[in-house]
């Protein structure tokens, strides 16, 4: 434990907090270009084919981003908007693609939680 005199001289150092989304460089979202669109399998208790894309961001970093929702229209060279948010059962996936923004279409026929998936209200 420091003495009062040592605290007067040096003071306390703040602990630097580590960011969970370093590739966004402090921005809420970043634009990027898909370099590869593929499926991958989740960690142990779960079983599925999760849709993910490798994206080269405008911050010059390449990240793996999850494509949420049922079905998608993404392919190589698609321009996408990437936000933070990890997928718990996919190791190394710390970003999600925003549906309904740029080249990504919203989920067709979605009636609940539409704004999360960029789905327009269906006509009656």
From Swiss-Prot:
GO terms for cellular component: small ribosomal subunit. GO terms for molecular function: rRNA binding; structural constituent of ribosome; tRNA binding. It comes from the Bacteria. SUPFAM superfamilies: Nucleic acid-binding proteins. The keyword Membrane does not apply. Keywords: Methylation, Ribonucleoprotein, Ribosomal protein, RNA-binding, rRNA-binding, tRNA-binding. The modification 3-methylthioaspartic acid is found at residue 89. GO terms for biological process: translation. Residues 1-32, 105-124 are annotated as: Disordered. InterPro entries: NA-bd_OB-fold, Ribosomal_uS12, Ribosomal_uS12_bac. Residues 111-124 have a biased composition (Basic residues). Belongs to the universal ribosomal protein uS12 family. Part of the 30S ribosomal subunit. Contacts proteins S8 and S17. May interact with IF1 in the 30S initiation complex. With S4 and S5 plays an important role in translational accuracy. PANTHER family: 30S RIBOSOMAL PROTEIN S12 FAMILY MEMBER (PTHR11652). This is Small ribosomal subunit protein uS12. It comes from Beutenbergia cavernae (strain ATCC BAA-8 / DSM 12333 / CCUG 43141 / JCM 11478 / NBRC 16432 / NCIMB 13614 / HKI 0122). The lineage of its organism: Bacteria, Bacillati, Actinomycetota, Actinomycetes, Micrococcales. The gene is rpsL.
